[in-house]
């Protein structure tokens, strides 16, 4: 994908989340438009730069955009991001997040291990069973 190719080894969840959130804002601004949202190279470049993409990776952006867009000078926004889902996958876990609530997902170093942290808000279900979040009497994880 354009995002993955542009970011290369510096592709991290925070940057991808920032790009998704900015794309989602644009999608919301145009949700009444009958035509799909189209972004030119400069618009996508601005979104990437303001989402925290490093300057050295922005130098790669032009060739990645041209390879993705081909002869076109613009891309449909859905070629850059999926407005219907925000999914985090590891080999053992798949987490689907409301694409408008990516703010609930963060990464954090806990006890020396990189962890995905999801803010729990409202009802929680595990396999269709309503459960409660750990209470305030439980031990909180230490941060390093």
Placement of each model-derived feature along the sequence:
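C-terminal, beta-strand-rich globular interaction domains
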Residues: 52-53, 57, 66-67, 72-144
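Long, hydrophobic alpha/beta structural blocks
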Residues: 1-84
């Amino acid at each position: 994908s354009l995002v993955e190719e542009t970011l290369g080894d510096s592709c991290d969840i925070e940057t991808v989340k920032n790009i998704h959130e900015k794309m989602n804002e644009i999608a919301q601004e145009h949700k009444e438009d009958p035509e799909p949202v189209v972004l030119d190279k400069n618009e996508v470049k601005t979104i990437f730069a303001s989402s925290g993409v490093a300057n050295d990776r922005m130098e790669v952006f032009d060739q990645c955009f041209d390879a993705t867009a081909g002869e076109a000078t613009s891309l449909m926004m859905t070629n850059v991001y999926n407005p219907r889902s925000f999914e985090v996958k590891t080999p053992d876990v798949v987490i689907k997040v409301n694409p408008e609530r990516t703010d609930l997902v963060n990464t954090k170093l806990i006890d020396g291990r990189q962890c995905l942290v999801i803010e729990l808000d409202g009802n929680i279900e595990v396999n269709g069973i309503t459960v409660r979040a750990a209470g305030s009497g439980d031990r909180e994880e230490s941060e390093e």
